[in-house]
């Protein structure tokens, strides 16, 4: 919701009074990970976008706001064509994508068409380069900030030098965040398993989980992951008999983690970083309580 509100502020000068009786339609694109590793969060993202469209309609009654949703797939190969579909649909601006690689691919299409985009979740540090990614904005901090914050979190939790392993996907989000965490923590202060890199499509983590269980030094692990892979890793660690402290970034921080787990009690004690509410958070909590389904957003 906050992302769309920021778009409204950006377009406020363009959305002044309209002398025509017929309302002008303003199309806003929305790149949502309907498929892929962040799919469990897609319903929440969509609900928030719909609520924001309702707010915009109240703020600017002379306009009809239309949300055009496309699947980003949490994948550049999906998000690029989706962005072109939004361009062809005549959108003024785009909200998204969630995943960094998807935002990078979409930006190449959208910026070429002169369409700005604002992401609600893409944190790769490289996206801060305005020359490489023109007309890209985000309302979440870069992993250049989240990485050191994660290191501080683990220090405060009592993780000792030489006790931490870092698991990270090799995609734009996972590698960027894992790099930031290792840089802040110190590569020479990792445990004997060290850093483990894997493809986001990997589904078998039993071998690395067995290494963690056999280690005499690895009492903590940081997951630079999404939801689906984090669940598989956590379950593999439990199956191997490892019972240390699990940490993570914003990727596995959503409530979708509970739906993905076969045994959500394994999440007890897991500690993650996540951007806090900003000064423009407004009355979101009250808005959610008044409008969200009683059984939660599914």
Predicted regions and their residues:
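Extracellular/periplasmic Venus flytrap/periplasmic-binding protein
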Residues: 81, 125-126, 134-241, 279, ...
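Active-site-proximal beta-strand/loop segments in catalytic clefts of secreted hydrolases
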Residues: 31-34, 70-73, 96-100, 120-123, ...
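Beta-alpha junction/loop-to-helix N-cap segments that form part of ligand/metal-binding clefts
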Residues: 23-25, 40-47, 54-130, 139, ...
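Immediate post-signal peptide segment of exported/extracytoplasmic ligand-binding proteins
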Residues: 19-30, 59-64, 155-162
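Periplasmic-binding protein-like
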Residues: 86-98, 118-120, 163-168, 193, ...
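Extracellular/periplasmic periplasmic-binding protein-like sensory domains
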Residues: 234-298
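Secretory targeting signatures
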Residues: 1-25
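Glycine- and acidic-residue-enriched helix-capping/strand-helix junction motifs
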Residues: 35-47, 172-176
């Amino acid at each position: 919701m906050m992302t769309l509100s920021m778009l409204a502020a950006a377009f406020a000068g363009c959305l002044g009074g309209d002398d025509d009786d017929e309302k002008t339609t303003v199309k806003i694109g929305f790149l949502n990970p309907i498929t892929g590793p962040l799919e469990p969060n897609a319903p929440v993202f969509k609900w928030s976008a719909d609520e924001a469209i309702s707010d915009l309609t109240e703020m600017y009654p002379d306009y009809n706001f239309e949300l055009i949703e496309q699947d980003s797939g949490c994948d550049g190969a999906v998000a690029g064509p989706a962005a072109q579909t939004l361009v062809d649909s005549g959108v003024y601006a785009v909200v998204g994508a969630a995943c960094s690689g998807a935002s990078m691919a979409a930006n190449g299409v959208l910026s070429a068409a002169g369409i700005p985009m604002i992401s609600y979740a893409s944190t790769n540090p490289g996206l801060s380069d305005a020359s490489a990614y023109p007309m890209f904005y985000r309302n979440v901090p870069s992993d250049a900030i989240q990485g050191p914050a994660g290191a501080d979190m683990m220090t405060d939790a009592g993780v000792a030098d030489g006790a931490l392993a870092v698991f990270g996907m090799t995609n734009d989000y996972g590698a960027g965040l894992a790099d930031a965490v290792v840089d802040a923590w110190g590569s020479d202060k990792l445990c004997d398993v060290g850093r483990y890199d894997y493809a986001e499509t990997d589904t078998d983590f039993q071998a690395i989980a067995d290494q963690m269980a056999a280690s005499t030094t690895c009492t903590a692990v940081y997951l630079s992951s999404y939801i689906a892979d984090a669940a598989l890793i956590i379950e593999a660690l439990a199956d191997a008999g490892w019972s240390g402290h699990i940490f993570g970034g914003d990727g596995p921080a959503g409530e979708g983690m509970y739906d993905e787990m076969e045994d959500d009690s394994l999440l007890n004690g897991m500690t993650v970083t996540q951007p806090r509410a900003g000064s423009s958070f407004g009355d979101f909590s009250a808005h959610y309580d008044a409008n969200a389904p009683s059984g939660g957003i599914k």
